[in-house]
From Swiss-Prot:
Pathway entry: Amino-acid biosynthesis; L-methionine biosynthesis via salvage pathway; S-methyl-5-thio-alpha-D-ribose 1-phosphate from S-methyl-5'-thioadenosine (hydrolase route): step 2/2
One GO BP: L-methionine salvage from methylthioadenosine
Protein name: Methylthioribose kinase
Residues involved in substrate binding: D225, R332
Tagged with keyword Kinase: yes
Enzyme class label: transferase
PANTHER family: METHYLTHIORIBOSE KINASE
A GO term, aspect molecular function: ATP binding
Gene3D superfamilies given in the database record: 3.90.1200.10, Phosphorylase Kinase, domain 1
Keywords: Amino-acid biosynthesis, ATP-binding, Kinase, Methionine biosynthesis, Nucleotide-binding, Transferase
HAMAP family to which the protein is assigned, alphabetical: Salvage_MtnK
Record's catalysed reaction(s): 5-(methylsulfanyl)-D-ribose + ATP = 5-(methylsulfanyl)-alpha-D-ribose 1-phosphate + ADP + H(+)
Function: Catalyzes the phosphorylation of methylthioribose into methylthioribose-1-phosphate.
Length: 393
């Protein structure tokens, strides 16, 4: 039959055909996706529920003028299954994958809240940083040369060649926001700040280096899009979703993206409500280091993991990369194609423009920063310096 796009009606029939519901069951189906690339259907018969996710052959945010391979759905399904090998508590269960229709049937997580929405609404997730720190440590370690035999790693790397979505990252994170490109999207009040950013040669040279790292450093399996909209949370649970951008890349990429999105939320808050975001930034790194170190000592398969001086160098390199990648993400989410609600939904225009200017300023500081040590307090320090300088609307 070949590929076809599901509707709410055909999604129900698909689920019945594959035995998820009885043929006579009264199944309620709603398309609930708010992302840029896929359809997401929730199906519920009153007793059980599932999620059907289907990749579209184009970017939904743009339309059919931006074609994409539906093979990314297979990559997403494989990534979730690999994550589940190491951290099953932190990902949804994958029930099945249909490669021809680019459909993945997964656990319904509607008992939880998308973390971005929860943070905007002022919800608190005390275990978020512990869970994400441990998720990152396990996945990044076990799919790298440190936790996986080199021949196995090369084979695994080959299954995550993801050209379409890597090209999106290359363009939308590292290229377009730093020059005159049609994909950029920002308010006219930011034009002077944007012009200054685009003319900053030192900044562009640093961004070029971070882009080159993303292009060439195939160090470990990365989620590739680990922002707070790709995580479900409750006070006791955390689930990472949507790894369709998964590929082999730099250790620091996912860490930097996650931290950047916490910083964006902090910029949207009043000063007295920001401390919880810095708690999560600092704890994410500390749990990552603690867990990664234990795995390195106890599970390392690469010969030089026995050299005590090697681990601190690796952690410093990861931290340095995370800082720069976080800076790129801050700028991309402020003036690039895909914004975040944390900033865009600030109702007061003056406050919103001020927060966006501060995001751009902080992004530049992080990209240019030459870190000499893996001091996680750096994010709090540069944030406070940026805000106190009085970047005004």
């Amino acid at each position: 039959m070949g590929y076809y796009s599901l509707t709410e009606i055909t999604a129900v029939q698909y689920a019945k055909d594959y035995g998820y519901f009885e043929e006579k069951a009264n199944v309620i189906c709603h398309e609930i996706g708010d992302g840029n690339l896929n359809y997401v259907f929730k199906l519920d018969d009153g007793e059980k529920s599932i999620i059907i996710k289907q990749a579209l052959p184009y970017a939904k945010v743009v339309g059919e003028s931006w074609p994409l391979s539906i093979k990314r759905a297979t990559i997403e399904s494989k990534a979730l299954q690999i994550f589940a090998q190491y951290v099953p508590d932190y990902v949804p269960v994958v029930y099945s994958h249909d490669e021809e229709l680019a459909i993945t049937v997964i656990e319904d997580l509607s008992r939880l809240t998308i973390t971005r929405k929860g943070l905007i609404d002022g919800e608190e997730y005390p275990l978020l940083s512990q869970h994400i720190g441990r998720f990152l440590a396990h996945v990044l370690f076990y799919t790298s040369d440190f936790g996986l035999q080199s021949e196995e790693k090369r084979i695994l790397e080959g299954t995550f060649v993801n050209p379409d979505l890597c090209k999106i990252t290359e363009d939308l994170v590292f290229t377009d926001p730093f020059g005159h490109y049609d994909t950029n999207d920002y308010e006219p009040d930011l034009q002077l700040v944007v012009d200054e950013l685009w003319s900053d040669k030192t900044l562009k040279l640093k961004v070029a280096q971070y882009k080159y790292k993303f292009l060439t450093r195939k160090e470990t399996l990365i989620h590739g899009d680990l922002h707070t909209g790709s995580i479900f949370s409750s006070p006791s649970e955390t689930k990472v979703i949507d790894p369709e951008f998964a590929t082999y890349g730099p250790f620091g990429f996912d860490i930097g993206q996650f931290i950047a999105n916490l910083l964006l939320n902090a910029l949207s808050r009043e000063e007295e409500k920001r401390s919880v975001l810095f708690f999560h930034i600092e704890k994410t790194w500390s749990y990552f280091v603690e867990t990664f170190t234990k795995l390195w000592i106890g599970e390392g398969v690469e010969a030089y993991t026995k050299e005590k001086q090697w681990l601190p160098i690796i952690l410093q390199n990861i931290f340095t990369d995370a800082v720069g990648f976080a800076g790129c993400e801050l700028i991309r989410r402020t003036i690039g194609l895909a914004h975040v609600a944390d900033l865009d939904e600030i109702e007061n225009k003056e406050t919103r423009i001020q927060a966006k200017k501060q995001a751009l300023s902080l992004g530049k500081e992080l990209i240019k920063y030459e870190s000499k040590s893996a001091d996680i307090q750096l994010f709090r320090t540069l944030f406070q310096q940026t805000v106190s300088r009085g970047v005004k609307a």
